[in-house]
């Protein structure tokens, strides 16, 4: 029988060498829950709560808590933690100056959700202010508030709290219960399936034909595919997570070999940080046990803020430090002449024959109630999306 260490390292070594686990169980958990009744309280928004969870379950290994000033500054300026480990996105806990003044260094803070439920405890080691414009410019490449990630930066409190965390309760993902797998559980799954090489695919969109083509192209060279959709906070116009999850199940069931693809949620908030977020996504998939990671066109982008292949260019600079193989794909399209999916590498035909697909186009057509042509989406997927969005509109009283 395989040991825990053998399972953890079966496919890949976690980022930083150790898969972090800051979840408490049993008597230790019960004791901290009791103690926390006396701790000062802080309510986390959905974004910070998802960060807390990902630190605790090891998705953000080697982080053990919210970043201190040395790590934060190094990440913003140099894409590395203070100890030299590659890390591209600040993972921080913002509060107002008034809130920060209420907490003493060395104290423990009870971390609650907006549902007034206790989720964890922060051991407060640092409080520090930061330059919002610098964070926006360095991390997102712009200071424009029209960028959803930058808007979040400007809306945050002016002080960051830092220190190690412990998790006592999990946020509710019960609607995706079957697919709620921690990094250690995903690694166990790969071990049980005998997958030694696994490609991870990050998405916040329904899987359209271009995605499917890229996933299957990658699958030709590895043992398995981990479809790892983000189900945390996204933009208001993104397709709701429950609808997307239905669409992922349908496409895997109907168009992928049963023993070659698996689905597991990534419970993170979407930052839309483009190239820098592509690096974070690769690190997270390494922690989930993947050996390969797909970076396509405008990865984690929004609007026209990033170049089509800017994420691929940045991640290529750090590939030696990543510990995961990056699979870079050109923009795929449907060629009406080839009558197939293709890229510029495989199709000789003029652009007038190319039907370009994107998550944005799919969302627009669905919002306008337009049918999705077969070049865009598998019919089973289109049906799920149309039905799911209709359900959401009815729930929201939109008819």
UniProtKB/Swiss-Prot annotation:
What reaction gets catalysed by this protein? sulfate + ATP + H(+) = adenosine 5'-phosphosulfate + diphosphate
Identify one Pfam family in the record.
Answer: PUA_2
Name the domain of life.
Bacteria
Part of which pathway?
Answer: Sulfur metabolism; hydrogen sulfide biosynthesis; sulfite from sulfate: step 1/3
**Enzyme class per UniProt:** transferase
Biological process terms in GO annotation: hydrogen sulfide biosynthetic process; sulfate assimilation
CDD domains according to UniProt: ATPS (cd00517)
What InterPro entries would the database entry show? ATP-Sase_PUA-like_dom, PUA-like_sf, Rossmann-like_a/b/a_fold, SO4_adenylyltransferase_pro, Sulfurylase_cat_dom, Sulphate_adenylyltransferase
Keywords from UniProt, A to Z, are: ATP-binding, Nucleotide-binding, Nucleotidyltransferase, Transferase
Q: Please provide, alphabetically and separated by semicolons, the GO molecular function terms listed in this UniProt record.
A: ATP binding; sulfate adenylyltransferase (ATP) activity
Stated EC number for the protein is 2.7.7.4
Q: Which family does it belong to?
A: Belongs to the sulfate adenylyltransferase family.
State the protein's name.
Answer: Sulfate adenylyltransferase
- Its source organism is Staphylococcus carnosus (strain TM300)
Write the lineage as a comma-separated list.
Bacteria, Bacillati, Bacillota, Bacilli, Bacillales
């Amino acid at each position: 029988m395989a040991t825990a260490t053998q399972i953890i390292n079966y496919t890949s070594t976690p980022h930083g060498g150790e898969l972090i686990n800051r979840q408490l169980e049993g008597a230790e958990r019960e004791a901290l829950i009791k103690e926390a009744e006396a701790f000062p309280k802080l309510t986390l928004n959905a974004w910070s709560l998802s960060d807390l969870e990902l630190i605790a379950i090891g998705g953000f290994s080697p982080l053990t808590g919210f970043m201190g000033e040395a790590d934060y500054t190094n990440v913003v300026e140099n894409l590395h933690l203070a100890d030299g480990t590659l890390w591209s996105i600040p993972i921080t806990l913002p509060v107002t100056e008034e809130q920060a003044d209420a907490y003493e260094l060395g104290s423990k803070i009870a971390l609650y959700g907006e549902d007034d439920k206790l989720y964890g405890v922060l051991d407060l080691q640092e409080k520090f202010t930061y330059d919002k414009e610098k964070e926006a410019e360095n991390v997102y490449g712009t200071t424009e508030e029209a960028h959803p990630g930058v808007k979040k930066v400007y809306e945050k409190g002016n002080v960051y709290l830092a220190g190690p965390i412990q998790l006592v309760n999990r946020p509710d993902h019960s609607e995706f219960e079957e697919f709620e797998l921690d990094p250690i559980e995903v690694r166990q799954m790969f071990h049980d399936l005998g997958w030694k090489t696994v490609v991870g695919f990050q998405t916040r969109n329904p899987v359209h034909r271009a995605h499917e083509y890229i996933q299957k192209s990658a699958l030709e060279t590895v043992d398995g595919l981990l479809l790892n959709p983000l189900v945390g906070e996204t933009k208001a116009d993104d397709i709701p997570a429950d609808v997307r999850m239905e669409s992922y199940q349908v496409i895997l069931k109907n168009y992928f070999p049963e023993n070659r693809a698996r689905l597991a949620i990534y419970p993170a908030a979407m930052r839309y940080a483009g190239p820098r977020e592509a690096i974070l996504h690769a690190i997270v998939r390494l922690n989930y046990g993947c050996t390969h990671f797909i970076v396509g066109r405008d990865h984690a982008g929004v609007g026209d803020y990033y170049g089509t292949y800017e994420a691929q260019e940045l991640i290529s600079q750090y590939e030696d430090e990543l510990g995961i193989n990056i699979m870079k794909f050109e923009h795929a399209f449907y060629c009406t002449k080839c009558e197939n999916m293709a890229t510029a590498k495989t199709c000789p035909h003029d652009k007038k024959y190319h039907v370009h697909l994107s998550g944005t186009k799919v969302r627009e057509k669905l919002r306008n109630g337009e049918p999705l042509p077969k070049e865009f989406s598998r019919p089973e997927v289109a049906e799920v999306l149309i039905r799911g969005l209709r359900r959401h509109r009815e729930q929201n009283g939109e008819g």
